[in-house]
Design a protein with these regions (language model features):
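Early extracytoplasmic/domain-onset interaction patches
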Residues: 22-73, 79, 396-423, 456-457, ...
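Cysteine-centered nucleophilic/redox motifs
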Residues: 52, 133-135, 168, 272, ...
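Surface-exposed, acidic/Ser/Thr-rich flexible loop segments
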Residues: 62-64, 69, 122, 128-183, ...
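A surface-exposed beta-strand-loop module
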Residues: 84-155, 186-221, 406, 410, ...
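Secretory-pathway-linked proteins and extracytosolic
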Residues: 142-290, 413, 419-435, 483-485, ...
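Short, conserved helix/loop micro-motifs enriched in His/Cys and acidic residues
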Residues: 281-304, 334
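Hydrophobic/aromatic-rich core segments of domains that either
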Residues: 309-395
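Long hydrophobic segments that form regular secondary structure
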Residues: 388-483
Length: 608
C-alpha cells in the first residue's frame, strides 16, 4: 500500500511538471543574444557587423529552421569576413565550422536575372547541431565607398523564436544626421560621441516570437520595427531619379508600332501595361540589392527584364512618350512615413498616376489591373519623384466601398428562378479600367453575384471611376435541392463583399490584427414569388447584431406567398485588433450562419 501511494504521488508530480513548461521549452529555439552594428565611415564606405548566440531546443530548429544561415552580398564591392562560426554542444564540446560549411550560390531571386548574377549568397551550414546546443555566429560585411548610396534600414525586431537580448548600434561620422523612428515599442535611443563618430544604440530584452495568422496586415504594421536612414525622402528619391535618361530610338519606334491605330487612351495604357508587365521579364530584386538605383531604360530593354521599380519607370516614360501624362509616384504606408526619414527599404511601392477622362488614376504595370489602385492607398502617403507630397486621387468619402443588390424573382415548381436584378458597386471593387477597355466587361459586375450562365441580358445604367449600377435579366435552373417534400435553396451574395476577403477559418481569438482590403458595406434585398403548392416552412426570421465594429441584419418574411429577404453587413474599419476581434467574430458568425441563409420550402400534397 505504501509503494502504491509513492507511485501515485510521483505520477502527480511528473504530470504537474509536464504541464508547466518553461518559456524555453515552448519554442523550437531561443536567441540568447543578437547584435547588429551599422557603421558609416567618413569616406562613404560602410561596415555591417552581425553576431548571435542561438540555442537549439527541438529537432525542427536544426532540421528546418536554423540549420543554415544565408548572407547575400556583392563580392566585387563587398568583403565578407567570418569571425566566429562554432557550435557549443550540450556537453560543452566546441565544434568549429569546417571549410566545406561555407558555400557560395546565386540568390534565388537573382535566378533568371542576368543583370544581377554578380550577387552571391553565402550558405553557412552549422555543424555539430543537437538538442541543447548553442551556435555562436559572428560575421562582417565591408562595403566599398560608393557602393551603397546611403544607410537605409527597416528592421523588424521580432524573430520566429524569442530573443532574450537584442542590441542595434548605428555609428555615423560626427555632423552626419541620422533620422530614425521606433514603432510599437517604447525603448529610447542612447546617443553618444566618441573618436569622431556619433553612436546611436537601442537595447531590447525578452522579445516575443513572431506570430503568423491568416489575413494579417500585409505591411506588417503590427510588428515592432526600427527604421533609420541618413537621408530625407527627397534625397532618397533623388537616387531613384538619378538615371533620368530618355527612351532611345529603338524603344520609341517599337512603342509607336504597338500603339498605332489605338484611338482610346485606355487602349494605349493597356497595350503598354501588357508590353511592360507581361512581355518584359520580372527581376524581383529587392531595392537594397539593386543599390536603390534603377538601370537605364536602354539596359532594361536590352536585358528584357526589370525590377518592379524599373518597370514602373519604363511604363512612365512610355506613357508620356505616347501622349498620356504620367507621374511616377511612391506610395508609403502612413504609419511609417516621416518627412525627415527617407526609407525605401521594404517601405513602399512605385506607381504611375495618370489623368484619364478627367479623373486621376493610379496604375500598376499589370495589364490585368481592373480598377483604380488609389482606392487601396487611402492610408498611404503619396510622394512624387522629388519627395514632395501629392494629393490623394480620391477622397475618403468617395472611396467608401458599397455593394447593393436588389432583385424581384419568380420561382416555378421546377426550381427555376427568373426575374430582374439590379447590382451597384462603389469603391475599390469597381472594375472601371476593365469597363473603359471593353464595355462588355461591365458584365463582370453582375457575375460577381450571379453565375455567368444565368445572365440573359443586362443594361449599364451608370459606370464611372467611383462606381456603377447595372440591371440584368436572370434565369437560373435547378436552384434548389430536393429532400422528400422539402426544397432548399439560398440566394447569392457578391464576391465583392466580405467573401472576397477569403477568410476561410475564423479563429476563436487572435494574437495579431486582422486586416481587410477595405471596409465592408453590402446589402441584398430580394423578393421571391413562390410557386403554387409550396409554402415557406420557417417562422419569420429577424436577426440583428450591432457593436462598435459594425452590424448585421437578416430578415426573411412571407406575405401573399412572396418571400421578402433582406441581408446587410457593415464593418466600419479595415484593421481589426485582437481586442476588437470578438466583435468581428460575433458579426461573422451571424452572417455565415447557414440557418439564416437557407430557405426551406415544403410542397403541399394536394388531395385527388
Amino acid at each position: 500500500m505504501k509503494l502504491k501511494h509513492i507511485l501515485y504521488f510521483t505520477a502527480i508530480v511528473l504530470l504537474a511538471g509536464s504541464c508547466q513548461k518553461s518559456t524555453t521549452e515552448e519554442h523550437d529555439a531561443l536567441f540568447k543574444s543578437i547584435k547588429k552594428v551599422y557603421e558609416l565611415k567618413p569616406d562613404g564606405s560602410m561596415n555591417y557587423h552581425y553576431q548571435h548566440q542561438l540555442k537549439y531546443i527541438t529537432h525542427l530548429s536544426f532540421n528546418r529552421m536554423y540549420g543554415e544561415s544565408f548572407i547575400i552580398y556583392h563580392p566585387d564591392y563587398q568583403e565578407l569576413t567570418f569571425n566566429t562560426v562554432e557550435t557549443t554542444m550540450a556537453d560543452g564540446k566546441v565544434v568549429k565550422a569546417p571549410e566545406n560549411a561555407f558555400n557560395k550560390v546565386l540568390p534565388r531571386f537573382a535566378a533568371g536575372a542576368p543583370a544581377f548574377n554578380h550577387l552571391r549568397e553565402m550558405v553557412v551550414t552549422h555543424t555539430g547541431l543537437e538538442l541543447g546546443c548553442t551556435v555562436n555566429f559572428d560575421y562582417e560585411i565591408h562595403s566599398r565607398a560608393g557602393y551603397l548610396p546611403f544607410i537605409n534600414e527597416n528592421i523588424i525586431l521580432q524573430e520566429d523564436v524569442p530573443v532574450e537580448q537584442l542590441e542595434i548600434v548605428v555609428k555615423v561620422p560626427e555632423g552626419t544626421e541620422l533620422n530614425y523612428t521606433l514603432l510599437n515599442l517604447d525603448t529610447e535611443a542612447k546617443v553618444s560621441s566618441s573618436e569622431g563618430y556619433t553612436q546611436y544604440s537601442w537595447k531590447f530584452k525578452n522579445l516575443n516570437n513572431r506570430v503568423y495568422e491568416s489575413n494579417q496586415p500585409e505591411d506588417q504594421r503590427h510588428l515592432p520595427r526600427l527604421i533609420f536612414a541618413n537621408v530625407t525622402p527627397e534625397e532618397a528619391l533623388q537616387q531613384v531619379a538619378a538615371e533620368d535618361s530618355p527612351l532611345n530610338d529603338e524603344i520609341r519606334q517599337y512603342v509607336t508600332q504597338r500603339i498605332t491605330g489605338k484611338k482610346k487612351e485606355i487602349h494605349i495604357i493597356r497595350e503598354l501595361q501588357k508590353l511592360v508587365g507581361d512581355e518584359i521579364n520580372d527581376f524581383n530584386i529587392p531595392l537594397e540589392y539593386a543599390r536603390y538605383t534603377p538601370r537605364t531604360p536602354d539596359k532594361v530593354w536590352q536585358s528584357n527584364g526589370a525590377t518592379p521599380l524599373e518597370k514602373s519607370i519604363l511604363l512612365n516614360k512610355m506613357l508620356n512618350f505616347s501622349g498620356i501624362k504620367s507621374e511616377l509616384t511612391y506610395a508609403q504606408p502612413s504609419f511609417m512615413y516621416d518627412q525627415s526619414l527617407g526609407i525605401l527599404n521594404g517601405a513602399g511601392e512605385f506607381y504611375n498616376v495618370v489623368t484619364l477622362n478627367g479623373e486621376k488614376l493610379v496604375l500598376t504595370t499589370d495589364a490585368r489591373q481592373a480598377n483604380n489602385q488609389a482606392f487601396y492607398l487611402k492610408d498611404h502617403v503619396l510622394l512624387d519623384i522629388h519627395g514632395q507630397s501629392i494629393d490623394q486621387p480620391v477622397s475618403e468619402t468617395e472611396a467608401e466601398p458599397e455593394v447593393m443588390v436588389k432583385a424581384n424573382f419568380q420561382l416555378n415548381s421546377h426550381g427555376e428562378l427568373s426575374g430582374r436584378a439590379e447590382v451597384s458597386v462603389l469603391g475599390a471593387n469597381n472594375p472601371y479600367l476593365n469597363y473603359l477597355d471593353q464595355v462588355e466587361n461591365a458584365r463582370e459586375v453582375i457575375q460577381s453575384v450571379f453565375p455567368g450562365n444565368t445572365i440573359q441580358d443586362y443594361e449599364v445604367k451608370q459606370f464611372d471611376f467611383l462606381g456603377n449600377k447595372l440591371s440584368a435579366d436572370i434565369e437560373q435552373k435547378e436552384l434548389w435541392k430536393n429532400q422528400g417534400d422539402y426544397y432548399i435553396f439560398s440566394l447569392p451574395r457578391s464576391s465583392y463583399g466580405i467573401e472576397g476577403e477569403h477568410i476561410r477559418i475564423l479563429l476563436q481569438e487572435r494574437e495579431t490584427p486582422l486586416q481587410l482590403s477595405q471596409t465592408i458595406n453590402e446589402t441584398y434585398e430580394y423578393t421571391v414569388k413562390l410557386p403554387e403548392g409550396f409554402v415557406f416552412t420557417a417562422p419569420e426570421i429577424t436577426r440583428e447584431r450591432t457593436n462598435t465594429l459594425g452590424s448585421v441584419s437578416i430578415t426573411i418574411t412571407e406575405e401573399d406567398n412572396t418571400l421578402n429577404v433582406s441581408h446587410s453587413l457593415t464593418i466600419n474599419q479595415r484593421m481589426i485588433t485582437p481586442e476588437e476581434y470578438h466583435n468581428f467574430l460575433e458579426l461573422m458568425h451571424l452572417w455565415r450562419n447557414e440557418t439564416f441563409q437557407e430557405i426551406i420550402l415544403k410542397k403541399i400534397q394536394t388531395e385527388n
